[in-house]
């Protein structure tokens, strides 16, 4: 009995310590700073650093981890060697999430090891409560089952779709580097394993809803703290979240917004295929896991790319606050979003003109934009479109 009482006391103490850690983070102003070194127009090393933690030792530990995860010290040393000639640039994206997590990616491009230009994608997924690097197994209830499910999805769904657009196309084994994004698990591959035709390191994002059966969605788990629950489950709050995001001209997980320059986006992400025509103009497919089965809609390019902007975003894969392509039924979203502002039948002729299948489209007006939800003849969501 004494042993059991002691265990209970220790468990309570551990719970209190976790609560204290959470409170201390909430009460401090934690920020992410851009740090780096610019030696020339061709040599620029930039990386993130976390500041503002009450625990200075923890802050140092986290920043050391960020540099280690992303090879920053090696890049700084290499930059010094290239002063007399050569190119090396790093850039990062990410930051602190609401759940006290630091998530970032670093892209390094140039003469990283030899004079031959190449690219490396790396990432950091750090729990700010204790500074530990989040492991893949922390995301799942059964890691072995999750790995099997991921590999099956990569080989059966992704590989056939992308193989013609890749220089190196080994989607398995699962790479070590990954990013815990709000909308899915993004895998970052070594360039020798998976690379695009433009010789850039490949990445693949798998929507969390595709792995729903094995996700650890416990209350204080990593994915719950990341906000994955609200992204894959349709709930009463989904309508307001959709309105908030779409009112900004965006869809979750897509690094483009309505009004963005098509020229700048194609320069940054590169074309996967030549622009395809549709009833309203052209559809752009870009390289990278964040754009898989996602298309940017614009005009007919009569004035040239440099004058064209994004007029719409179309997702044929992914999830937006419970609207999961290939899974959510029309009756389900009607029960949460209510009746649409308008609706239309999509005939075979209309479907062919828009590169979609026959069915129905529901239109919801949110601010300056219109959310279009396409369902097939069986009532399953097949595409999400946000347009002007």
Regions found by a protein language model. Give the residues of each.
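Short, exposed beta-strand-loop hairpins at the edges of beta-sheets
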Residues: 363-365, 369-378
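Short helix/turn-capping signatures at newly exposed starts of structured segments
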Residues: 71, 229-344, 380-388
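Long, charged/polar, surface-exposed segments that mediate recognition or autoinhibition
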Residues: 103-111, 117-158, 295-356, 361
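Sec-dependent N-terminal signal peptides of Gram-positive bacterial secreted proteins and lipoproteins
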Residues: 5-26
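Glycine-centered tight beta-turn/hairpin loop motif at sheet-sheet or coil-to-beta transitions
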Residues: 38-40, 117, 286-292, 298, ...
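Compositionally biased intrinsically disordered regions enriched in Thr/Gly
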Residues: 24-252, 260-263, 282, 376, ...
């Amino acid at each position: 009995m004494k042993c059991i009482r002691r265990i209970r006391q220790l468990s309570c103490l551990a719970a209190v310590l976790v609560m204290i850690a959470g409170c201390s983070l909430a009460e401090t102003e934690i920020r992410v700073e851009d740090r780096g070194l610019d030696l020339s127009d061709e040599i620029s090393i930039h990386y993130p650093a976390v500041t503002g933690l009450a625990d200075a030792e923890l802050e140092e530990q986290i920043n050391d981890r960020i540099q280690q995860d992303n090879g920053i010290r090696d890049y700084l040393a290499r930059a010094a060697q290239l002063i007399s000639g050569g190119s090396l640039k790093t850039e990062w994206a990410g930051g602190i999430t609401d759940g006290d997590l630091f998530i970032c990616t670093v892209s390094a491009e140039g003469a990283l090891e030899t004079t031959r230009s190449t690219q490396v994608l790396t990432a950091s997924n750090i729990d700010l409560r204790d500074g530990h690097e989040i492991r893949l197994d922390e995301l799942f209830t059964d890691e072995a089952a999750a790995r099997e499910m991921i590999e099956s999805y990569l080989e059966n769904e992704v590989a056939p779709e992308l193989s013609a657009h890749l220089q190196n196309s080994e989607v398995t084994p699962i790479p070590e580097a990954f990013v815990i994004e709000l909308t899915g698990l993004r895998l970052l591959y070594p360039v020798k394993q998976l690379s695009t035709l433009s010789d850039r390191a490949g990445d693949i994002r798998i929507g969390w809803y595709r792995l729903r059966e094995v996700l650890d969605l416990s209350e204080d788990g990593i994915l719950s703290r990341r906000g994955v629950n609200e992204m894959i489950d349709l709930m009463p709050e989904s309508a307001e979240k959709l309105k908030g995001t779409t009112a900004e001209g965006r869809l979750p997980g897509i690094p483009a917004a309505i009004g963005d320059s098509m020229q700048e986006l194609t320069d940054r992400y590169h074309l996967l295929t030549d622009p395809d025509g549709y009833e309203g103009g052209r559809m752009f497919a870009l390289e990278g896991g964040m754009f898989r089965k996602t298309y940017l809609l614009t005009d007919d390019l009569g004035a040239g790319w440099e004058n064209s902007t994004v007029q719409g975003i179309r997702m044929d894969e992914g999830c937006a606050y419970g609207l999961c392509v290939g899974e959510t039924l029309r009756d389900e979203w009607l029960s949460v979003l209510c009746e649409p502002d308008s609706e239309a039948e999509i005939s075979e002729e209309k479907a062919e003109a828009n590169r979609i299948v026959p069915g129905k489209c529901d239109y919801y007006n949110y601010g300056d934009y219109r959310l279009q939800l396409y369902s097939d003849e069986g009532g399953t969501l097949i595409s999400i479109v946000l347009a002007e």
